[in-house]
Amino acid sequence: MQILVDADACPVKDIITKNAKKYGIPVIMIIDTSHELNDGYSTVITVDKARDSVDIKLINMVQRGDIVVTQDYGVAAMGLGKGAKVLNQNGLIYSDANIDRLLFERHLGQKIRRAGGRTGTIRKRSKENDEAFEKALLLFIKPESEGPRDLKI
């Protein structure tokens, strides 16, 4: 198991690194050339700055049982298809039970925006978001003897 992170705009890199170190899990942070990253623990892979280049690299690397952190529903769907455990930066665990709905909602939002409409606002990140993310991440990485493993949505 390893943790692969779509790290370009990921606000929880420190939380990932802290917990991965604690449990001895390798972390791969994937960024494009417009970002710099060095946390002293993670392997950082830098790809060309092009549409979806980080996403494509991540999906090409993911294996069954890996953990993927992304806020991109398309990447989440492909990660699930490859047998990965996938979550976003707010602790939402993507699953076969919710990914179709999320992809459809994204599609509807794109149609509304193309027609000149608005679909909502982005809220400021909170401490509660960080706590929810860490709790969800630990569900994936803690050994079974250390805590509950029920990931039903």
Swiss-Prot record:
Cited InterPro entries: UPF0178
Record family assignment: Belongs to the UPF0178 family.
Xref: HAMAP family: UPF0178
The protein's name: UPF0178 protein Ccel_2994
Organism: Ruminiclostridium cellulolyticum (strain ATCC 35319 / DSM 5812 / JCM 6584 / H10) (Clostridium cellulolyticum)
Source organism phylogeny: Bacteria, Bacillati, Bacillota, Clostridia, Eubacteriales
